[in-house]
């Protein structure tokens, strides 16, 4: 099995922890992304690579009809329990099980690095009605904060602000226009004893040969920095970046 495929399949083993401990998408940011999409039951918002539904649930809470598309059955199970089987579909960015022009908007959170753009872009363009938007969202640890920077030195975490390069989200090309960037800073809180499970939801950590050493070092760093949280609660700073492009 190729390393990329091994990493892709690692998430299902930690689906419950992923669902509980991955950061939630900021509601204000998601509302701005979908502000003018005019979604209906016939033309919903489509969340591709939806995982266990962190982004899907925010879309739903804002009152937008939403359909989630996720290839991993283990990750899709929490989605189906929350949305119903008819709104949690097996598929991928390269193979979306919807008719032409079905989507008012398409979103994808923390997933573009798994995608083959040469297949995904025309497929997204197919299901998205003209004038609709495609948005790629990244949630990045803010390693401008000292203790988060130290954490990144001992744990294999790629999703951090200093690592991110705008080139990671290239221009989509035809039939899409240029990207518009929105971003928002926020903090996620969880119990310090949940930190190891939170970190295991990242494939680069879960599959590392020295994973237990990395997790022990992470707990030690949090303990050494009072500013990381209070009363046994970790306060992890993040920046969400959303890149939206309009379908011509």
Tell what function each PLM region has:
Residues 13, 17-18, 25, 32, ...:
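Tryptophan-centric aromatic hotspots in well-structured domains and transmembrane helices
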Residues 104-118:
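A short SAM/SAH-binding and catalytic strip from SAM-dependent methyltransferases
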Residues 34, 57-60, 121, 125:
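A structural alpha-helix within SAM-dependent methyltransferase catalytic domains
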Residues 1-40:
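Conserved class I S-adenosyl-L-methionine
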Residues 168-248:
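Conserved Class I S-adenosyl-L-methionine
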Residues 119-189:
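Conserved catalytic/acceptor-binding region of the Class I
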Residues 94-106:
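A short acidic, Gly/Pro-enriched loop at the edge of an enzyme's catalytic core
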Residues 44-46, 52-95:
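Class I SAM-dependent methyltransferase SAM/SAH-binding core
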């Amino acid at each position: 099995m190729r390393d990329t495929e091994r990493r892709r399949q690692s998430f299902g083993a930690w689906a419950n922890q992923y669902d509980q401990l991955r950061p939630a998408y900021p509601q204000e940011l998601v509302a701005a992304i979908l502000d003018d999409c005019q979604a209906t039951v016939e033309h919903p918002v489509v969340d591709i690579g939806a995982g266990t539904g962190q982004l899907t649930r925010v879309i739903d809470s804002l009152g937008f009809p939403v359909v989630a598309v996720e290839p991993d059955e283990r990750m899709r199970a929490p989605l189906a329990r929350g949305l119903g089987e008819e709104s949690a579909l097996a598929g991928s960015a390269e193979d979306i099980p919807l008719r032409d022009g079905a989507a008012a908007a398409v979103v994808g959170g923390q997933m573009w690095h798994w995608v083959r753009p040469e297949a995904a872009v025309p497929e997204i363009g197919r299901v998205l009605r003209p004038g609709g938007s495609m948005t790629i969202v990244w949630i990045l640890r803010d390693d401008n904060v000292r203790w988060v920077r130290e954490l990144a030195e001992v744990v294999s975490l790629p999703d951090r602000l200093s690592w991110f390069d705008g080139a990671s989200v290239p221009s989509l090309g035809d039939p899409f226009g240029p990207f518009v960037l929105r971003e928002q800073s926020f903090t996620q809180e969880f119990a310090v004893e949940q930190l190891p499970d939170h970190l295991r939801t990242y494939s680069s950590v879960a599959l590392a040969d020295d994973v237990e050493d990395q997790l022990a070092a992470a707990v030690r760093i949090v303990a050494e920095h009072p500013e990381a949280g209070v009363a046994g609660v970790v306060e992890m700073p993040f920046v969400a970046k959303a890149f939206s492009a309009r379908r011509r």
